[in-house]
Regions:
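Active-site nucleophile and cofactor-binding loops and adjacent substrate-binding regions
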Residues: 40-48, 68-72, 100-120, 142-146, ...
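Non-catalytic terminal/interface segments that mediate subunit docking, oligomerization
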Residues: 65, 248-358, 363-373, 465, ...
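Peripheral docking tails and interdomain loops at the edges
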Residues: 263, 271-275, 386-388, 408, ...
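Glycine/charged-rich beta-loop-alpha catalytic/anionic-binding loops adjacent to active sites
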Residues: 29-36, 97-111, 133-139, 313-325, ...
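N-terminal amphipathic, basic-rich helices that act as targeting or association modules
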Residues: 1-79, 204, 215-217
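A glycine-rich helix N-cap at a beta->alpha junction
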Residues: 86-96, 161-175, 369-381
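Glycine-rich ThDP/TPP pyrophosphate-binding loop and its adjacent helix/strand module
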Residues: 108-264, 270-278, 282-287, 407-517
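Cofactor-binding active-site loop characterized by glycine-rich and histidine/acidic residues
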Residues: 41-162, 299, 304, 313-314
């Protein structure tokens, strides 16, 4: 096998055309084997095999620098840059991450996982090169809907002013995670339909040179195009048309479902993951919103290219019709759009992953909260038990969002609480509201009668003395278990509190606790610095009450075992109880 002999990109240059095509087939088969057993980004990588081979055949990495946008399509790149074993041998599958990583190889220049950044990063590399008087090629590879992100357009706008070498490979597979949206993609389609000859050309209008490759999965055509632009002295776009999921028919016919995959049966395409048929907050939310949409034409769902985060599959998007909006990979626009809709009397609900909400801090503060627009934001996978790649952590949202004035950030502990919060948020007109959606569905069957408009009123779920445990959201269960252990060990019955509100303190209740409590414990599923617990600690700062904050320390975690991280931060009920028992004797 040729792929087994590729230890560095120079090995690719020694192959002839026929051998390069065989190499592509071998790489694709290796990817299929690994992805079927291990999971990962499927469609983007199968579509980029030939382009990656051509890039390394023509250019001289790492002297020439290649920056992959998002870098979820960098698996073929890793195979050709000394990391093939992690794709050929099952016992080495975890030796590499799913994204570019400079710690793995000199051929990776940035740790990247969020979208639309490659052009700006490449512009920086090019400017740095020019300042030093060097002459290497700088290549940005961008696709899978990333052009819809504002930073990508900002980068393109700046690129034309470089007046030096910069090669931007636009990987056009006519898809984002789901289908593409926006006028930009209409222009890409027009360019595809005219073999790049349309007079209406976004890239040329921005002052960039342009090369079109009709078959972006043909190695020979790609090599010709890349040789044409190599060592160019002016920024140029190479527009290549690829097939997402190429080489696996099931994925070619179901591109959205095969953007990412878990382990699956290679013959049938069926997932190996157990389907327990239990409830999940995503599908539950979509069903509720669809019901509301039918009853109220002002209710609208908003996504920034991740519609299934809150359950809007292709069928449900069709059912929602114009009451569902996909702005593309543009979180900033999603929040500003929601603010505008709310100001016009609409009832917008924006579903977003915790890791992506950080991309729109300014819009949360300026466009939404200063204007006090009553939009609803549903924040998913905000947990140490969420995504565990360093670029996709969901543990920073509390410090970021809970300190913005006017925003009401809620943390439900049960399904019933979540549904009540969602209903209240959509129907109220006084506040922008965010809800930190738990990962696992917990149901206690209790009817929720709380009036959430009475802000910052915590709920005491168990009265006790000496010790109070304030346990936030999904970690309420940790607090409840901790209280049980403490009572069994000491005969002290702790007070247990569900704070509900992340954004404020119940000063009246906290003041009352001073009368018969010596220790107050806070438990949260996020980082401690700037988090919920520090608000409680600040309240008791000049009192005799001792406050213990439990959460995560501030660090960039990567590919971690959540149980190990929880234990390392002394976040298990047993560890917390041990600490408390040591204090009270």
């Amino acid at each position: 096998m040729y792929v087994e002999k590729i230890n560095q990109p120079t090995d690719v240059k020694n192959l002839n055309s026929e051998q390069l095509h065989i190499l592509a087939d071998e790489m694709r088969q290796a990817l299929l084997q690994k992805l079927s057993k291990h999971g990962g980004h499927f469609g983007p990588n199968l579509g980029m095999v030939e382009a990656t081979i051509a890039l390394h055949y023509v250019f001289n990495s790492p002297t020439d620098k290649i920056v992959y946008d998002v870098s979820h399509q960098s698996y073929p790149h890793k195979m050709l840059t000394g990391r093939k074993d992690a794709f050929l041998y099952e016992d080495k599958y975890d030796d590499v991450s799913g994204y570019s990583n400079p710690d793995e190889s000199d051929h990776d220049f940035f740790t990247i996982g969020h979208t639309s950044t490659s052009v700006s990063l490449a512009c920086g590399l090019a400017k740095g090169r020019d300042l030093k008087g060097d002459s290497e090629n700088i290549i940005a590879v961008i696709g899978d809907g990333s052009l819809s992100g504002g930073e990508a357009l900002e980068g393109l706008d700046f690129a034309s002013e470089l007046n030096s070498n910069l090669i931007i490979v636009v990987n056009d597979n006519d898809m984002s995670i789901a289908e593409n949206h926006g006028g930009l993609y209409k222009n890409l389609k027009q360019l595809r339909d005219t073999d790049g000859k349309s007079e209406c050309n976004l890239f040329k209008s921005m002052g960039l040179d342009y090369v079109f490759v009709k078959d972006g999965n043909d190695i020979d055509s790609l090599i010709t195009a890349f040789e044409q632009v190599k060592d160019s002295t002016y920024p140029v776009v190479v527009h290549i048309c690829t097939q997402k999921g190429k080489g696996y028919k099931i994925a070619e016919e179901n591109k959205e479902n095969w953007h990412y995959c878990g382990p699956f049966n290679l013959e049938t395409g069926k997932s190996d993951m157990s389907q327990d048929g239990g409830e999940d907050y995503s599908s539950m939310t979509a069903d509720i919103l669809l019901k509301k949409m039918k009853e109220d034409k002002t209710v609208v769902g908003i996504t920034s290219a991740t519609p299934t985060v809150f359950g809007f599959t292709e069928d449900k998007r069709k059912e929602a019709g114009s009451q569902f909006v996909d702005v593309g990979i543009a979180e900033e626009t999603a929040v500003a759009l929601a603010s505008g809709i709310a100001k016009s009397g609409g009832k917008p609900v924006y579903g977003v992953y915790s890791t992506f909400i950080q991309r729109t801090y300014d819009q949360l503060s300026q466009d939404l909260c200063i204007n006090n627009s009553p939009a609803t934001i549903l924040v998913y996978w905000a947990s140490v038990y969420g995504m565990n790649d360093v670029t996709h952590l969901g543990i920073y949202d509390i410090p970021m969002m809970s300190n913005i004035p006017n925003l009401v950030y809620l943390a439900p502990t049960t399904k019933e609480e979540y549904l009540a919060m969602l209903d209240w948020s959509i129907e109220q007109n006084d506040h922008p509201v965010a809800i930190r959606v738990p990962i696992s569905v917990v149901s206690d069957g209790k009817k929720v009668t709380k009036d959430f408009s009475k802000l910052n009123e915590y709920e005491v779920t168990q009265n006790g003395s000496k010790i109070a445990i304030v346990a936030l959201g999904s970690f309420y269960s940790v607090g409840a278990k901790t209280a049980e252990i403490i009572e069994n060990k000491t005969d002290v019955k702790p007070t247990l509190i569900n704070p509900i509100y992340i954004t404020g303190t119940d000063d009246k209740l906290l003041e009352q606790l001073k009368a018969n409590h010596d220790v107050v414990i806070t438990v949260e599923d996020g980082i401690l610095d700037g988090g919920f617990g520090e608000k409680i600690a600040r309240f008791y700062g000049n009192s005799d009450v001792k406050v213990l904050n439990y959460g995560l320390k501030k660090e960039f975690l990567d590919r971690y075992n959540p149980e190990e991280i929880v234990k390392a931060n002394r976040l298990t009920p047993e560890q917390i109880a041990e600490d408390v028992c040591g204090i009270i004797g």
